[in-house]
Curated annotation (Swiss-Prot):
SMART domains: C2 (SM00239). This is C2 domain-containing protein. Changing F124S: Results in impaired host cell invasion and egress due to defects in microneme secretion. It comes from Toxoplasma gondii. Vaccination of mice against the protein elicits humoral and cellular immune responses and contributes to a prolonged survival time during acute infection and a decrease in brain cysts during chronic Toxoplasma infection. Residues 1239-1257, 1405-1414, 1492-1502, 1550-1561, 1620-1629, 1675-1698, 1712-1722, 1729-1747 have a biased composition (Low complexity). Residues 1-28, 414-423, 1192-1205, 1215-1228, 1569-1584, 1701-1711 have a biased composition (Basic and acidic residues). It comes from the Eukaryota. Residues 557-678 form the C2 domain. It is a peripheral membrane protein. Residues 1-54, 355-377, 398-428, 1192-1267, 1405-1424, 1431-1654, 1666-1747, 1822-1841, 1879-1910 are annotated as: Disordered.
Amino acid sequence: MMKLKEMVEAAEAKVESKPPQAAEEKAPDQAAGGAEEDVAAAPAEGGEGAEPLDQAEIEKMLFDESLGAQEYTYEEFLDLIDQPPEERGEAEDERKHWSYPRRWKVVLWNLQIQNYMDDNFSAFMEFEFGGTREECKVHKGTSVLIYATGQDKNYLRTPVIPDVSNAGPVDMHFRKAFEYRGSYLDLEREKLKIKVWEYRNWTLNHLEAVYEEALLNLATGETHVERDLYKFIKGRRSRRCRISFHLYFQELYDFELSFVKWRLVQIMPCLTLQEKIANRGKNKGGYTREATIGFKRHQLADQAKYVFQQRQVKREMQKRDSQRELLPGASRPEMLGGFADKGSARLSHLGFESAMKLPNRGTRSPSGLESNRPEDGNRNMEEIFLQHQATILASDQLEELPASLRPPLSKRRKGEDKKDGNKADGPQVKMTISLMHASSMNKGLGLVSSERPADGIPRWDNLGEIYFRGTLRDLDSTYIQVVVEDTTAPKVMRQIGYGQIPLRGVVDYSCLSTELGTPMWLALQAKMEGWGHELKEWCFGFVEGTVMVAHLPRYRQLGEVSESDSDRVYLILRIKDVDQIVTPDNRPVVDSYVEVSFDGTSRRTRTVRNTLNPVWDDEVTIPLRLPAFRDITESDVTRKGKVWLDVWGTGPGYVDHLGGCSFSLYEIFFNEKHNKRNLTAMQRIDLEANTRQSYETRVFSTSRRLAFIHKADRPSTIQFEAWTCPDILEVSGIDKLPEPERITTTSNFPRALRNTYERLKRMYAEVIEKKGLVNPDTGVGPPRFFDVEFLDQRKETHYAPTMVTRIRPPFGVDSESSVFHYCRCVPFAVKRENLVFTPEFAVQIRSGNAMDHSILMTSLLLGLPAFAFVCVGTLWDKHMHAWVATFHYDDDRACGVVKFWETTTGLVYTLKHRFRDPYTLQRLSADPEFGILKMMNIQRRKRLSILGVSVDADTPDYISRSGEDLVQSEFPTGGAKLPYRSLDIMFNNRNVWLNIQDGNPAKVWFDIWDVEQWYQFSPGLHDVPPCFIVRGFGAKVAEWQFDRAAQEIQGKVLSDITAFRATRNLPTKWNRDDVLDAFLQMGLELLHQAATARDEDFQLARLKLEDWKKAFYSKVPCSYRVRGAPLHFNTYDSKTISDAIIANVDFVESRDRSAFFSLAVMLYNLPGELVSTYVYICVTQKVTERERRRILAQKEKQSREDAQRKARKQRRKAGHEGADNGAEDKQGAEGNEEEHGDAAAAAVAEESVSAEAVQGAEEPKKVVKKGAVPRVKKRSYEQVEGTEVAAIAIERDFFTEAEAPDFKNLMTDVEHAINTHLGLSPGRVRAFQARYAEKRIVFAVGPPMDDATEADAVSSVALMEKLRDILPSMAHEEGRFQEVTGGGATLQWDGPGTNILDRIAQEQATAGEGEQQTSEGIPTRDMQVDGTAVLEEAGEKSDKKKKKKEKKEKKEKKEKKEKKEKKEKKKKKGGETAAEPEEASAVLAPPPVPAPAAAIPSVLLPTDSEDGEKEKPKEKKKEKKEKKKKKDGETDAEPDEASAVLAPPPVPVPAAAIPSILLPADGEDGEEEKPKEKKTEKKKEKHTEKKHKKKSETLPESETTAVVTVTPGEEDETSPLVPVPSSIASSEAPEPPASTRVTPAPEPKAKPGLSMGAALLAVRARSRLQRKHLAQQLSSSSSSEVSASSASSLSPSSSSSSDFAETRAKADALRARLQAAQARLAAARETEVSSSETESSETSEASFLSSDGEWDALWQSQRAAAMERQQRLQKMVSGVKAAYRRLEEENTRLAATRRRDDKLQRQVEAERERAVELLKEATRRAKEEKDLIARQPPPARDWSDTVVLSTPQIFVNSQAACAPFADSGRDEGERDEWYEVSDACSRRAESSNESRTTAGAKLRQQQLDLAGRT
């Protein structure tokens, strides 16, 4: 055989490459299994297009059985014979699986041959099916022998067909059925060999062609086999003929069918059926008996059966009545009526009553509907319900109540007699399952269940097993018959339901369900009584269950087998052709087939490949679920619906719907004139009996135009024929069928809903209008989507709940996450038309948009079951969108949870606390399947209560509790940031709910049972059937194809990435280690488990995935890093996956030459030929130093952000108690310290983790730049007319953070958040300032554009007002805006036309003036409290320098004014002495705005007053002398400085008596100096710096402490900010000379009080006070109350003079000791070596300090206390600043409120004035009219002078007048306040009827008189 193949290839190589003839086709590729190529020989037309072969080659190509035989030597042939048979598998069970001999059923029929040559020949064929016979050429010596090995199994031969021409296919009249035996390995070894022979008379037959193919290809291929046979003649390979046949080749298998989890839903017991029969309507809206049925009058069998049935029923009931021992006078109808009454009473707990009485509520005025205010919403709903009460009550019918809501029948009480013989208290049901239409070996198989109570839902967890023997085709064609019986009913009437369920596809989708049909006895009774058409609207319940198939055959044959059984009815269609295929993307060729769907099942034709003009000529057979022939009724036929034909196109990686059409069964039996069609003779084949049978039937032949789901201009037409086998009209006796009704939206609705559907739609539209849901000024605004009808793929309009139904998920999809994953595996597509696909169509076409995925997912979730809904709304771009919502009850938090499942992105949004009444949700979620009905009943009861319908007080607990204990909150808060702009409606398979709350889904309460929040479209509890039939999900992708796809993906991705990098001159290295591949695949498997895990298993799956990540990263070498990308795809197309990886994975283009790539692929096979593909690609590369630093910096930044976010969450969780108690600075400081501590700890932890992320990396030095955040960051903006500028006050303090945020991103985030929540387009909002120090973000909202949309057309003022309301909730929503604001934000806006920048500038100006006067009450420079100095930070110093430069210009301008003012004051007061106290009092005055830092009584007092103190000439001379002394003797100054540093604090003074007085350290807060004085000051500073450098060599570590050094000889202008005693601070005194200064003696212990610097300052102030005569200054300033009070509060103590003397003496002693110490230190320094200078100085210093132990202890304690006070002061300062800012904001807010209130007050006053003007105008007009009437002539005296005013009533005449206050609820006898009006005087009218009659007569007489006069 191999030699033959080589010969053929050599011959083809010699053929010249010329275009082939039209009649020639290329030979198909040979299949696997060693089959040889088809060869044939025939003379073509002249042999054109081929080169003649050599004669020697032609002689070798003998067409006999030895053609292509293998050649062996004799020894090789012997070895071939002795070779043992092949085995496969390692374990014994696996070897047995492959080599076990099996039975296969083979049927070959419909064999045809078509001649492609011009010559006619008589043909016959031989088939060798299986066998191992093989011919071999054996070289034995010089001869060549032909030997045959193996054996034949099945040999078939057809009859001879004469004169086979090329006119068309010729039937060979051959049909054969037999059994083949062989193992799975035999299918691979053995072949089917077909030989085509030409029959010749009087000579040998001629072999025309030979065909071979492995049996495995036939066992896995299609049933329709079509092959072309070729042969060589005259050197040309031409097509000889084509053979086609049907081959049924499937394994006989023993299937174990397990029936588990079966139940009955909404069944009606026998008594309920009898009650419904008794109460049924008489021919309501139906056809009459004669018009619909038209029975043959000679059908006596049915009449006899009916009479016998009624007799049996009567006899059974009489027997039961006698057993019950009825009371005298009690008859059966009365008992039945009593049962009905009791049943109605039991239904009353749900609010259903057969007769509902409405109280006389009177008529409501429709004017109440015109109000659109929110507070009138409930009133509007009540008015709408009252107006449409007839519609609501008409659609709410008791007779259509789903049986699932019916209450259980009353059970027998204890003590009641059981003589009736019943085994149970209530109705008991049982179910019988049997196989129908099965093969002869399976007939009689069935199961009978045990009895269950009929109340509720009868369930059977395990019914048993049935062992079915047959092929997969036999199992698919089998139906199971389900009969439900009520064992307590009479024997004749026990059957209460009947159904047939096809087992087609049960091996792939094990869930079965069907609607129960009419019982046989009821169908017979309705047929004989003439109301059979009414049964179409009756629902007898549903049966559901699961059939598990334990084991399956390995191989499965594709295609259909057209076979009919004589005991059932079939619908047969012969699909001919389609004139032209129109594809959506204009494909040149396509593989197509036709699928026929009818009666809950579908069949398909064979696939015609590579053509746009397919010709099938194939028959499709569909079994019909009908009872026995004579039991078929008219309703059984009409309720079947339409027959649909769909043309599908398939190819590698795509499925297209190429059009569809439909017809009805009525068209098969009747023509266009409604006459019966003629009978036509047809034939059918019985494969089991291998016979052909003839029958007569009516044939419908037509052509229909296909309807497309895509837009197409070209038409496409399909031709087909249809008939039934046998003819239904003949076997059932039905003479006439009703004409098919036009399919509408309400065709399958229950009667009550169908009759009121249009009115319900009008009511729905009215609710939308009255609620103002489409009003652009309220709520979210348009566009909104409230449609309750959708257009499906067949261009039919359907009610939204009919698009959803309960679908049991396929096996393995058993959780909400797995359902979500399965739906996302359906590819997404963009539709050209607005069509909605049904779930089964979306799975079949394997594509859809968000709406299709949401409907599919909701249907699957309902089948779990779950509380699921389809949500329809809009995205932020205002496009329509759909997603899925599920309701859950959280037992831990005792709250309701809503989950939004976004199918497009794969994200799940969880919203907690979204139910005001979680208790009701808890009760309803316990039964998700039927809890929705109970929830609808709650809403129904509320609606009926509005209508005034009496409801029984015995209400279930879950209904009575609804509405109680509600969470009184306007909107829910918190939750994830949603991508949805509005939520408009929700629907599932039960109803549609309209959202009448706020449109934003984040602000919606999901208590859909509350009529005030959700409007229910359909008031009744109707069970609406779906508009489609659930047919399962189909098979999975074949295993061999699946395995090959995985290998193709991996190879394609490797080659494409390598080629892609090669185009960029980059090398690619792949790590193909087996261990690594297995480990990566394990990670993908864990990822899939986490994506599909149940809620209770999710944490475990996530933990396993985290452990895998840690193990993976732990194997990374040092100084290397790994970057990976896990990707998911819903296809196995290798090109699509490869292109997506290259486009989306950035590190594919990595230029690092040390990079190694790794790849892993994992595929999951899902039902419906869906695939879930996971790909993980990673790269390992060496990390450079620059890259390492960048990575660490990014991780450090991320760690800081995480720490800050964590701290903010902790603050929000703990509350804002510090903000409420702002005056308590100590608590605020502690809180700030804790926050910084948490942030620092988190940052350190994250930093350590980041350092470990890169192996072998060194930790970089952490440099934190203080003061990096500016106070204000700005950018430009354009302010036009109509722009509103405002600010957002945030809680986050950016100014205190280490790094400044990205200003551009910050502004973009703010703009995006405002635009998103206001629904504005980008560019309308402009954020342009970030005032970090003030915690404000300034933005502007521009005016609307001319061509703006409806949402953008809103004015800026309205947007600001709306933003004021929603801004706090925006800050609470998780997202970027929450991070920016810190969880809290308020709007600062002063009203229309204002600019917040003006307000900010005013605040800054006010703050600047207060700073000059009071320094804001907060110290901002180096300050000293209790001897401890607080040094300002570097960032503050830099800011101070900038401020100094900015303020210099302002100060110079003020300087001139101040000088003039000082001169004027001197002239007025007569001298400097009189002016000084006033200046001091002005400085000591409290600030205008009270600061919250009351606990820190800091009062600013400059050493030299800000107004400038003019000293006397004598004093100036003294100062000059002191300066000279400084220059002459530095040794005298140094001890003074040392004493100032080392001096202990003086005698402690109580803090309450001596508050700290802060003195400014420089000219910024003190006196402004002259230019000359500044120069001298700079010289002094340089001089002191030099002295400090010298002292640093001699002094110990005193300068590292926070103690301020005071130089005794310095001027007051340059003295630092220090606290002074209050006794000295109230007045100014001249500085004492240096000789008078006394240093106090050291104390043994450190005590709180004034430091040494304060003591020296006190001495200096004391001497100045003495020289300036303190008594005279105080007496001169006694007139000022403020200064007097200040002086009294700061008065010195009585013992101050003695303390000063002691201090001076101690200072002198200390100065002497310091001089001696300096001398010793200088000597020691000279003796030390230069290399150990520092060491010797420390030793000498230590010896000096150790010379006095008390000094050392005192110094250490003083240093520790100073540091502690410094830290405490910093905290206090920050607290004071924060409190001051809060007070400023509060004052600003109060001012804005006052301005707004004033504006409103002005508006009210204006309205009041306008109303007064209108009142005056009305009074004037009334007076004019009255004068005009007075000027008319008076009437005659006999006229009546009274007119009666009454309330409006309904009268026959027109005497009633309209009163201003109408009361329609009063009766005629209850009228009051009637008055008679006569000559502008009124009095009470008489209420008697006589006075009314008299008044009426007078009025009529007046009218007559007036008529006569005119």
